[in-house]
Curated annotation (Swiss-Prot):
Biological source species: Geobacillus kaustophilus (strain HTA426)
Record keyword Ion transport present: no
Highest taxon of source: Bacteria
HAMAP family per record: PurQ (MF_00421)
Protein name per Swiss-Prot or TrEMBL: Phosphoribosylformylglycinamidine synthase subunit PurQ
Entry EC no(s): 6.3.5.3, 3.5.1.2
Record-linked Gene3D superfamilies: 3.40.50.880
UniProt keyword terms in alphabetical order: ATP-binding, Cytoplasm, Glutamine amidotransferase, Hydrolase, Ligase, Nucleotide-binding, Purine biosynthesis
Length: 228
C-alpha cells in the first residue's frame, strides 16, 4: 500500500505522519508538494497538521485553493481513504469534502495536551481495529478546533453514524456535541482534530493512534489482491 503525505507551506506534522506509516507500519509513503496535480499512484492520501499558508484568513482557507486539492477531491471521489488531521481537517472542511466549519477554541487559547476520545463508530475503514466505545488517548494541538454545523447537518451526522470520535469527559475546545472527528457520507474521508500520528509509540505516552493507521491498511488489504 502506498500513502501520500501532502505538504503545504507551513505544514509541520508531515514528518510525524511519514514516521507513523514508514517506521511503525512499514508501508510505502511519499511526501507530495502542494502543487502536485496527480495522486493516482497512491492508495491513500494524508493531509497533516500545521499552519498552512500561515493560517491567514482562516485555518485552511488558502490551502483549499492549492493545486493538489483537485487531486485530493479526485481521490476521495474514487473511494480512496483520505485523512485530514488538525489543519488537514480544517482544509477538508474549507474544501467542502466534509460538512461544517471550524471556529476558535471556546477559551480563545491554543491547547496542546493529550485528551481522551471515545470511538463512536468502529465500523469504518479508519476505525476497524478499535472496539466500539473504546476510550483512547490522543494529543491535540490547535487554536481553532471548535467544530460547528447547523442543526440539520448535525442530525444527518448522527443518523448516518458519521461522528467517529467524540471527546471523552472534558470537551477541550467547545466543539459541538463533543465532536472530535467525522467522516463523509461515503465513509472514506475522515477529518479529526487530535493527532493520531503523535500517538504511535507507548514510550512517548500513547500508541492508541496506531490502530487508526492499521485500520486503513487492513481495509486496503481486504479490498485488494496483494501479490508477493
Amino acid at each position: 500500500m502506498k500513502f501520500a503525505v501532502v505538504v503545504f507551506p507551513g505544514s509541520n506534522c508531515d514528518v510525524d505522519m511519514y514516521h507513523a506509516i514508514a517506521d511503525e507500519l512499514g508501508e510505502e509513503v511519499e511526501y507530495v508538494w502542494h502543487d502536485e496535480d496527480n495522486l493516482d499512484r497512491f492508495d491513500a492520501v494524508l493531509l497533516p497538521g500545521g499552519f498552512s499558508y500561515g493560517d491567514y484568513l482562516r485555518s485552511g482557507a488558502i490551502a483549499r485553493f492549492s493545486k493538489v486539492m483537485a487531486a485530493v477531491k479526485k481521490a476521495a471521489e474514487a473511494g480512496k481513504p483520505v485523512l485530514g488531521v488538525c489543519n488537514g481537517f480544517q482544509i477538508l472542511l474549507e474544501a467542502g469534502l466534509l460538512p461544517g466549519a471550524m471556529r476558535r477554541n471556546q477559551g480563545l487559547k491554543f491547547i496542546c495536551r493529550p485528551v481522551q476520545l471515545t470511538v463512536e463508530n468502529h465500523e469504518t475503514m479508519f476505525t476497524s481495529a478499535y472496539e466500539k466505545g473504546e476510550v483512547i488517548t490522543i494529543p491535540i494541538a490547535h487554536g481553532e478546533g471548535n467544530y460547528y454545523c447547523d442543526e440539520q447537518t448535525l442530525e444527518r451526522l448522527v443518523e448516518n453514524r458519521q461522528i467517529v470520535f467524540r471527546y471523552h469527559g472534558e470537551n477541550p475546545n467547545g466543539s459541538l456535541a463533543d465532536i472530535a472527528g467525522i467522516v463523509n457520507e461515503q465513509g472514506n474521508v475522515l477529518g479529526m482534530m487530535p493527532h493520531p500520528e503523535r500517538a504511535v509509540d507507548a514510550l512517548l505516552g500513547s500508541a492508541d493512534g496506531l490502530k487508526l493507521f492499521r485500520s486503513i491498511v487492513n481495509y486496503w488489504r481486504e479490498t485488494h489482491v496483494v501479490t508477493a
